[in-house]
Protein backbone atom coordinates (compact mmCIF):
# COMPACT_ATOMS: atom_id res chain seq x y z
CA UNK A 1 0.00 0.00 0.00
CA UNK A 2 2.83 2.41 0.88
CA UNK A 3 4.55 1.70 -2.44
CA UNK A 4 1.30 2.42 -4.30
CA UNK A 5 0.90 5.71 -2.45
CA UNK A 6 4.52 6.60 -3.26
CA UNK A 7 3.93 5.95 -6.97
CA UNK A 8 0.76 8.06 -6.87
CA UNK A 9 2.63 10.87 -5.12
CA UNK A 10 5.40 10.78 -7.73
CA UNK A 11 2.82 10.91 -10.52
CA UNK A 12 1.02 13.86 -8.91
CA UNK A 13 4.14 15.92 -8.26
CA UNK A 14 5.54 15.00 -11.68
CA UNK A 15 2.34 16.28 -13.30
CA UNK A 16 2.62 19.61 -11.45
CA UNK A 17 5.28 20.81 -13.89
CA UNK A 18 2.96 20.04 -16.80
CA UNK A 19 0.13 22.02 -15.20
CA UNK A 20 2.42 24.98 -14.49
CA UNK A 21 3.66 25.02 -18.09
CA UNK A 22 0.06 25.18 -19.34
CA UNK A 23 -0.95 27.87 -16.85
CA UNK A 24 1.93 30.32 -17.41
CA UNK A 25 0.97 30.60 -21.07
CA UNK A 26 -2.00 32.76 -19.99
CA UNK A 27 -1.79 33.56 -16.28
CA UNK A 28 0.74 35.92 -14.64
CA UNK A 29 3.26 34.13 -12.43
CA UNK A 30 2.44 35.92 -9.18
CA UNK A 31 -1.28 35.36 -9.71
CA UNK A 32 -0.70 31.67 -10.34
CA UNK A 33 1.33 31.30 -7.15
CA UNK A 34 -0.99 33.43 -5.00
CA UNK A 35 -4.07 31.57 -6.20
CA UNK A 36 -2.43 28.20 -5.65
CA UNK A 37 -1.33 29.08 -2.12
CA UNK A 38 -4.65 30.68 -1.16
CA UNK A 39 -6.89 27.84 -2.30
CA UNK A 40 -4.52 25.20 -0.89
CA UNK A 41 -4.40 27.02 2.45
CA UNK A 42 -8.19 27.19 2.70
CA UNK A 43 -8.47 23.50 1.85
CA UNK A 44 -5.91 22.49 4.50
CA UNK A 45 -7.64 24.69 7.08
CA UNK A 46 -10.82 22.74 6.36
CA UNK A 47 -8.98 19.42 6.71
CA UNK A 48 -7.48 20.54 10.03
CA UNK A 49 -10.86 21.63 11.34
CA UNK A 50 -12.62 18.40 10.39
CA UNK A 51 -9.81 16.35 11.95
CA UNK A 52 -10.02 18.26 15.23
CA UNK A 53 -6.59 19.88 14.86
CA UNK A 54 -5.74 23.56 14.85
CA UNK A 55 -2.87 25.90 14.10
CA UNK A 56 -0.63 26.79 17.07
CA UNK A 57 -0.71 30.21 18.73
CA UNK A 58 2.94 30.26 19.75
CA UNK A 59 4.85 33.27 18.43
CA UNK A 60 7.94 31.10 18.08
CA UNK A 61 6.10 28.71 15.78
CA UNK A 62 4.70 31.52 13.66
CA UNK A 63 8.18 33.02 13.30
CA UNK A 64 9.28 29.64 11.95
CA UNK A 65 6.26 29.46 9.65
CA UNK A 66 7.00 33.00 8.44
CA UNK A 67 10.57 32.07 7.47
CA UNK A 68 9.71 28.68 5.97
CA UNK A 69 6.62 30.00 4.22
CA UNK A 70 8.82 32.53 2.44
CA UNK A 71 11.85 30.35 1.63
CA UNK A 72 9.96 27.07 1.21
CA UNK A 73 6.71 28.23 -0.42
CA UNK A 74 6.55 31.77 -1.82
CA UNK A 75 10.04 31.99 -3.34
CA UNK A 76 10.41 28.49 -4.87
CA UNK A 77 6.83 28.42 -6.20
CA UNK A 78 7.52 31.75 -7.90
CA UNK A 79 10.91 30.67 -9.26
CA UNK A 80 9.50 27.45 -10.71
CA UNK A 81 6.54 29.18 -12.33
CA UNK A 82 8.73 31.97 -13.72
CA UNK A 83 11.35 29.52 -14.98
CA UNK A 84 8.80 27.39 -16.81
CA UNK A 85 7.95 30.34 -19.02
CA UNK A 86 11.29 29.71 -20.74
CA UNK A 87 12.09 26.00 -20.40
CA UNK A 88 10.16 22.76 -20.88
CA UNK A 89 8.15 21.19 -18.07
CA UNK A 90 10.23 18.01 -18.30
CA UNK A 91 13.52 19.87 -17.90
CA UNK A 92 12.08 21.76 -14.93
CA UNK A 93 11.09 18.51 -13.18
CA UNK A 94 14.56 17.11 -13.86
CA UNK A 95 16.45 20.12 -12.49
CA UNK A 96 14.20 20.06 -9.42
CA UNK A 97 15.53 16.57 -8.65
CA UNK A 98 18.80 18.19 -7.52
CA UNK A 99 17.22 19.15 -4.18
CA UNK A 100 18.74 16.19 -2.23
CA UNK A 101 22.19 17.09 -3.59
CA UNK A 102 21.91 20.67 -2.32
CA UNK A 103 20.55 19.33 0.98
CA UNK A 104 23.68 17.23 1.54
CA UNK A 105 25.95 20.22 0.91
CA UNK A 106 24.02 22.59 3.17
CA UNK A 107 23.59 19.98 5.91
CA UNK A 108 27.35 19.51 6.13
CA UNK A 109 27.86 23.19 6.95
CA UNK A 110 24.65 23.97 8.85
CA UNK A 111 24.15 20.89 11.04
CA UNK A 112 26.29 19.00 13.55
CA UNK A 113 25.11 15.46 12.81
CA UNK A 114 25.18 15.19 9.01
CA UNK A 115 28.77 15.17 7.81
CA UNK A 116 29.62 14.68 4.18
CA UNK A 117 31.28 11.38 3.17
CA UNK A 118 33.33 10.37 0.16
CA UNK A 119 30.30 8.68 -1.41
CA UNK A 120 28.29 11.86 -0.95
CA UNK A 121 31.08 13.97 -2.46
CA UNK A 122 31.11 11.72 -5.52
CA UNK A 123 27.31 11.96 -5.67
CA UNK A 124 27.43 15.75 -5.55
CA UNK A 125 30.02 15.86 -8.35
CA UNK A 126 28.07 13.41 -10.53
CA UNK A 127 24.83 15.30 -9.92
CA UNK A 128 26.36 18.64 -10.84
CA UNK A 129 27.92 17.15 -13.97
CA UNK A 130 24.38 16.15 -14.94
CA UNK A 131 23.15 19.69 -14.29
CA UNK A 132 26.08 21.08 -16.27
CA UNK A 133 25.22 18.89 -19.26
CA UNK A 134 21.64 20.16 -19.19
CA UNK A 135 22.67 23.81 -18.88
CA UNK A 136 25.60 23.75 -21.33
CA UNK A 137 23.56 24.77 -24.40
CA UNK A 138 22.22 27.79 -22.52
CA UNK A 139 25.69 28.72 -21.25
CA UNK A 140 27.01 28.76 -24.81
CA UNK A 141 24.33 31.28 -25.75
CA UNK A 142 25.01 33.60 -22.80
CA UNK A 143 22.53 34.86 -20.20
CA UNK A 144 19.42 34.36 -22.27
CA UNK A 145 15.93 33.56 -21.01
CA UNK A 146 16.44 29.80 -21.40
CA UNK A 147 19.48 29.77 -19.11
CA UNK A 148 17.85 32.13 -16.61
CA UNK A 149 14.82 29.83 -16.51
CA UNK A 150 17.08 26.89 -15.68
CA UNK A 151 18.86 28.89 -12.99
CA UNK A 152 15.48 29.79 -11.48
CA UNK A 153 14.58 26.10 -11.12
CA UNK A 154 17.98 25.32 -9.58
CA UNK A 155 17.44 28.25 -7.20
CA UNK A 156 14.11 26.76 -6.13
CA UNK A 157 15.88 23.47 -5.38
CA UNK A 158 18.32 25.36 -3.16
CA UNK A 159 15.37 26.95 -1.34
CA UNK A 160 13.76 23.54 -0.76
CA UNK A 161 17.06 22.15 0.54
CA UNK A 162 17.45 24.95 3.08
CA UNK A 163 13.82 24.57 4.13
CA UNK A 164 14.26 20.83 4.71
CA UNK A 165 17.24 21.42 7.00
CA UNK A 166 15.75 24.15 9.16
CA UNK A 167 12.28 22.60 9.29
CA UNK A 168 13.75 19.60 11.12
CA UNK A 169 14.77 21.68 14.12
CA UNK A 170 12.25 24.51 13.98
CA UNK A 171 9.17 22.30 13.52
CA UNK A 172 10.22 19.30 15.60
CA UNK A 173 7.25 17.78 17.43
CA UNK A 174 4.66 19.52 15.25
CA UNK A 175 2.05 17.37 13.44
CA UNK A 176 3.05 17.38 9.76
CA UNK A 177 -0.28 18.67 8.44
CA UNK A 178 -0.22 21.49 10.99
CA UNK A 179 3.28 22.45 9.85
CA UNK A 180 2.25 22.37 6.20
CA UNK A 181 -0.82 24.49 6.93
CA UNK A 182 1.26 27.06 8.82
CA UNK A 183 3.79 27.38 6.01
CA UNK A 184 1.08 27.60 3.34
CA UNK A 185 -0.73 30.24 5.38
CA UNK A 186 2.35 32.46 5.51
CA UNK A 187 3.06 31.81 1.85
CA UNK A 188 -0.45 33.05 1.11
CA UNK A 189 0.11 36.13 3.29
CA UNK A 190 3.19 37.02 1.22
CA UNK A 191 1.88 36.28 -2.24
CA UNK A 192 -1.78 37.32 -2.25
CA UNK A 193 -1.19 41.07 -1.69
CA UNK A 194 1.89 40.95 -3.93
CA UNK A 195 -0.18 39.52 -6.77
CA UNK A 196 -2.99 42.03 -6.29
CA UNK A 197 -0.56 44.97 -6.27
CA UNK A 198 1.71 43.91 -9.14
CA UNK A 199 -0.35 41.71 -11.47
CA UNK A 200 -3.75 43.34 -10.80
CA UNK A 201 -5.52 40.21 -12.09
CA UNK A 202 -9.02 41.65 -11.71
CA UNK A 203 -10.01 41.20 -15.36
CA UNK A 204 -8.22 37.90 -15.91
CA UNK A 205 -10.21 35.46 -18.06
CA UNK A 206 -8.25 32.20 -18.30
CA UNK A 207 -9.31 29.58 -20.82
CA UNK A 208 -10.89 26.35 -19.63
CA UNK A 209 -7.67 24.26 -20.02
CA UNK A 210 -5.72 26.83 -17.98
CA UNK A 211 -8.39 27.05 -15.28
CA UNK A 212 -8.61 23.24 -15.09
CA UNK A 213 -4.80 22.99 -14.86
CA UNK A 214 -4.73 25.59 -12.08
CA UNK A 215 -7.38 23.72 -10.07
CA UNK A 216 -5.58 20.40 -10.57
CA UNK A 217 -2.25 21.96 -9.59
CA UNK A 218 -3.78 23.40 -6.42
CA UNK A 219 -6.05 20.59 -5.26
CA UNK A 220 -4.18 17.59 -6.60
CA UNK A 221 -0.60 18.86 -6.75
CA UNK A 222 -0.66 20.68 -3.42
CA UNK A 223 -3.45 19.60 -1.06
CA UNK A 224 -3.84 15.92 -2.01
CA UNK A 225 -0.08 15.56 -2.47
CA UNK A 226 0.62 16.88 1.04
CA UNK A 227 -1.96 14.54 2.58
CA UNK A 228 -0.45 11.53 0.78
CA UNK A 229 3.09 12.65 1.60
CA UNK A 230 2.45 12.86 5.34
CA UNK A 231 0.39 9.66 5.30
CA UNK A 232 3.38 7.79 3.87
CA UNK A 233 5.70 9.31 6.47
CA UNK A 234 3.38 8.20 9.28
CA UNK A 235 3.04 4.67 7.86
CA UNK A 236 6.67 4.07 6.91
CA UNK A 237 9.57 6.50 7.23
CA UNK A 238 10.90 9.77 5.90
CA UNK A 239 13.69 7.86 4.13
CA UNK A 240 11.22 5.71 2.21
CA UNK A 241 9.20 8.80 1.32
CA UNK A 242 12.23 10.55 -0.18
CA UNK A 243 12.34 7.82 -2.83
CA UNK A 244 9.69 9.91 -4.59
CA UNK A 245 12.62 12.02 -5.84
CA UNK A 246 13.39 9.28 -8.37
CA UNK A 247 9.81 9.08 -9.64
CA UNK A 248 9.03 12.78 -10.13
CA UNK A 249 11.47 13.62 -12.99
CA UNK A 250 10.63 10.44 -14.89
CA UNK A 251 6.92 11.28 -14.74
CA UNK A 252 7.60 14.93 -15.52
CA UNK A 253 9.63 14.08 -18.62
CA UNK A 254 7.10 11.51 -19.85
CA UNK A 255 4.10 13.81 -19.40
CA UNK A 256 5.89 16.71 -21.07
CA UNK A 257 6.70 14.50 -24.06
CA UNK A 258 3.23 12.93 -24.31
CA UNK A 259 1.05 15.99 -23.69
CA UNK A 260 3.17 18.93 -24.88
CA UNK A 261 5.35 17.10 -27.43
CA UNK A 262 8.53 18.09 -25.58
CA UNK A 263 11.57 16.33 -27.01
CA UNK A 264 13.55 13.80 -25.00
CA UNK A 265 16.98 14.54 -26.41
CA UNK A 266 20.13 12.53 -25.60
CA UNK A 267 21.31 15.52 -23.53
CA UNK A 268 18.17 15.43 -21.37
CA UNK A 269 18.31 11.65 -20.92
CA UNK A 270 22.03 11.82 -20.07
CA UNK A 271 21.37 14.54 -17.51
CA UNK A 272 18.54 12.44 -16.04
CA UNK A 273 20.81 9.43 -15.52
CA UNK A 274 23.60 11.47 -13.92
CA UNK A 275 21.35 13.47 -11.60
CA UNK A 276 19.49 10.37 -10.38
CA UNK A 277 22.82 8.57 -9.91
CA UNK A 278 24.09 11.54 -7.92
CA UNK A 279 20.97 11.50 -5.74
CA UNK A 280 21.43 7.76 -5.16
CA UNK A 281 25.05 8.27 -4.08
CA UNK A 282 24.35 11.14 -1.67
CA UNK A 283 21.78 8.94 0.07
CA UNK A 284 24.15 6.03 0.65
What name fits each language-model region?
Residues 1-33, 82, 142-169, 190-191:
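Glycine-/small-residue-enriched transmembrane alpha-helix faces in small-molecule transporters
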Residues 12, 16-17, 45-96, 132-133, ...:
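Specific transmembrane alpha-helical segments of multi-pass solute transporters/efflux pumps
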Residues 14, 18, 45, 69-74, ...:
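Hydrophobic/small/kink-forming positions within alpha-helical transmembrane segments
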Residues 23, 32, 36, 83, ...:
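Hydrophobic/aromatic residues within transmembrane alpha-helices
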Residues 35, 73, 92-98, 165-189, ...:
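Helix-helix packing/entry segments at the starts of transmembrane helices
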Residues 44, 66, 106, 119-138, ...:
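Hydrophobic transmembrane alpha-helices of multi-pass small-molecule transport proteins
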Residues 44, 103-105, 109, 141-199, ...:
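Transmembrane alpha-helical segments that form core, pore/gating elements
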Residues 46-55, 100-125, 250-270:
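C-terminal transmembrane-helix exit sites in multi-pass transporters
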